[in-house]
Amino acid sequence: MDSEHWISRLAAAKRFYAAQLGHADRAGMEEVDMDEEVRPEFACPYCYEDHDVVSLCAHLEEEHPFEPHAAPCPICSDKIAKDMLNHITVQHGYLFKNRRRLRRFVIPGSQALSLLSRDLREAHLQVLLGGGGHRSNNSSNTTNISADPLLSSFGLSFPTSDTEETSKPPISIPDDASVIKETPAQPWDSSIDSSLTREEREQKRKQASVRATFVQDLLLTTLFGD
C-alpha cells in the first residue's frame, strides 16, 4: 500500500512539473514574438525600402550620405533638406530607447527554464509529499540529510509516520538496582529511539529504506527526465 501511494504521488508530481515547464516555454516564445511585432518599420525616403529604425540609419549612412534634394522624414513626415540621418537620431532618438527596453524584457525559452529551477522544484516536492511533511524531532534525520549534498541542496524534510508515537513514561529504578549498568546500544540502533519495541524499530528501518529509495528515484527522474 505504501509503495502504491508513493508511486501515485510521483506520477502526479511529474505531470505537474511537465505542465509548468511547457507553460514556461510558451511564455518565453510569446515574449519573443511580441518583441518582433512591436518593432516598427519605416520606408527609406529616397529608395522606399522598408527598414526598422536601426537598419534605416545604417542604410542612410551607407547608401544616401549626401542627397541633393529634400525628402520627407519617414517618421514625422517633415521636409528635411539635408542630413536625414542626423534628424532621425536627434529628433526621434526615443525609438532607440524603446527598442532597447523591449529587448531587456525578452526572456528566451532556455532562460525561462533556468528561472524556474528553485521555485518549481519546491512546488514539485510539495505536490509529491502532499503539501510537505512536518520536520522530524529526531536529530539523526537532520544529520543524515545534511551529510548528503544532493539532499541538502533540495532542502528535503521527510514526513514521519501518520500517527506519532507517544514517548513512554520513564521507568523508575529502585535504589538497590542503581548499581546495574546500562547495556550499551547497538550501532544500528543508535539512530532509533531506544524506548521503541523491536517490531517498531524494524518498521522504522523499513520506512527509512523505502524513503531513501524513493528520493533516489525522484532525483534521477528530475535530473535526467524520463
Curated annotation (Swiss-Prot):
A Pfam family annotated for this UniProt entry: Di19_C
Top-level taxon in the UniProt lineage: Eukaryota
Region annotation (Disordered) ranges: 158-208
Comp. bias intervals (Basic and acidic residues): 196-205
Recorded family membership: Belongs to the Di19 family.
Protein name as annotated: Protein DEHYDRATION-INDUCED 19
